[in-house]
Regions:
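Claisen-condensing/thiolase-fold acyl-transfer catalytic domains that form or cleave C-C bonds
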Residues: 224-232, 324-388
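Active-site/ligand-binding loops adjacent to catalytic centers
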Residues: 24-26, 156-194, 202, 214, ...
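Active-site nucleophile and cofactor-binding loops and adjacent substrate-binding regions
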Residues: 63-76, 92-101, 192-195, 221-226, ...
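Positively charged, low-complexity intrinsically disordered leader regions
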Residues: 1-89
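Buried hydrophobic positions in well-ordered alpha/beta secondary-structure cores of metabolic enzymes
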Residues: 42, 61, 73, 80, ...
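A short, small-residue-rich loop immediately preceding and capping a beta-strand
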Residues: 76, 87-123, 216-230, 250-251, ...
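Active-site-proximal loop->helix
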Residues: 93, 101-164, 260-270, 381-389
């Protein structure tokens, strides 16, 4: 795949970032100006949580929920909107799971006078009406996916009229529309190299903030669906390690119901269900795999970012998977100690941090743990209501469906 192959979907500036070999790229002034609304985001030491857990570990968290959209997603949405506006693009199509990315792109589009059309995974569209309202408040249109507005969506609905959707399906719908018009581009909220690069502002700030605290992490943790917030916090620390700095453990925490890194295959696959994207080598459950519905909609993606996947293959990244109930349990423990309600996605990182803290307690080690609290859960209270009512289900993926999806991987995957 060359730059010209991606030109129907992305501005050339982002395509060149995708293939860049530069260590650093300057953040444009207009993007920096918008970042100033919430960046640098705060880092806290979770002393009350440490006390509640009675752990010798020191726990720090970087809080990305202070952004106007409530998550880390505007870090790349603003940059992508800027480069698209610079290229004369009038409309952006995109997908969203839980609505965090759609909200961020809607927010960014408003700043650069770009129309935004969001395909929201149907199960989240139904679960999170206030996320839809937030997108519409910023001027975006929001459509439940799969929809009858695209050929990709209609094909899915023909097979399964009750389909709850997936990020892979929503991507297909957004890509299909973007490819049809010269004034329209597609925008992706995770997975791609340039998206991960934009998010490293998180970890770059975290390194400076740890210096201010006179500390440095032994373990760096982030939740992982497509890999953008995990790489945002972890990659700068991994980079320091590769350049001779302190060795860390980087732990990506994924949902047990959609475990691309802990259960998937490292192979070439499509990034979407409709097979409209280029093939990418990544940890994948198969592009035709539809995960069961669960509340961390932003983590319901069949694949993992190629860079995160490669880092895991090199032994630079570890992966852990948890069901949603223990993640909500961890989130409530965190909220009652630190006063912040984590998003269901971020709750996976909280769970990972608590597991590491309890390991330190068992082993009598005073390690330093840093995790990325990627967003707040103010629009996800229905999920917490289910948790408190005891009706939250830990759904397992269908083993037969997974095997079938892996068997359908493109032939190149076997090479």
């Amino acid at each position: 795949v060359g730059p010209d192959d991606l030109a129907p979907l992305f501005p050339m500036s982002l395509i060149m970032q995708e293939v860049s070999g530069e260590r650093y790229l300057e953040i444009p002034g207009p993007v920096r100006d918008i970042y100033k609304q919430w960046r640098p985001s705060p880092m806290f030491r979770a002393r009350r949580l440490e006390k509640a857990l009675d752990t010798p570990a020191k726990i720090y968290y970087k809080y990305e929920g202070v952004s106007p959209a409530g998550s880390h997603k505007p870090n790349t949405a603003v940059a992508q909107a800027f480069y698209n506006a610079e290229a004369g693009i009038k409309k952006i199509t995109t997908e969203t799971g839980a609505g965090q990315w759609g909200s961020a792109m809607a927010f960014a589009g408003a700043f650069f006078d770009i129309e935004v059309q969001v395909f929201m995974v149907k199960v989240s569209f139904q679960q999170k009406p206030y996320r839809r309202a937030l997108m519409e408040s910023f001027g975006a249109t929001c459509i439940a996916s799969p929809s009858d507005t695209t050929q990709s969506g209609r094909a899915i609905l023909e097979k399964d009229p009750d389909s709850t959707g997936s990020l892979g399906i929503a991507i297909s719908e957004a890509v299909e529309l973007a490819a049809q018009r010269d004034d329209t581009n597609y925008s992706l909220g995770s997975v791609l190299n340039h998206v991960l690069m934009h998010q490293t502002v998180i970890g770059q700030e975290a390194i400076k903030q740890m210096e201010m605290a006179g500390d440095y992490p032994d373990v760096v943790i982030g939740c992982a669906g497509g890999g953008s917030n995990f790489s945002g916090i972890a990659f700068p620390f991994i980079g320091e390690q590769l350049r001779g700095g302190k060795k860390i453990r980087a732990v990506a925490v994924e949902p047990a119901a959609c475990p691309s890194m802990t259960r998937g295959k490292y192979a070439y696959d499509f990034g979407d269900t409709g097979n409209l994207t280029p093939l990418t080598k990544m940890h994948t459950l198969g592009s035709s795999f539809i995960p069961p519905g669960f509340h961390a909609g932003g983590l319901r993606y069949h694949g993992m970012a190629p860079l995160v996947s490669h880092a895991k293959e090199l032994g630079l990244v570890e992966a852990a998977a948890y069901h949603q109930t223990p993640c909500f349990e961890a989130a409530v423990t965190f909220a009652r100690s630190e006063g912040i309600i984590p998003a269901p996605e971020s709750a996976h990182a909280v769970k990972g941090a608590l597991e590491e803290a309890m390991r330190c307690k068992r082993e009598g080690k005073s390690e330093t743990i840093l995790f990325n609290l990627s967003g707040h859960g103010h629009f996800d209270m229905a999920a917490y209501t289910e948790y408190f009512a005891g009706t939250l289900e830990d759904k397992n993926y269908d083993e037969q469906a997974l095997s079938s999806a892996l068997e359908k991987l493109p032939p190149v995957a076997a090479s």
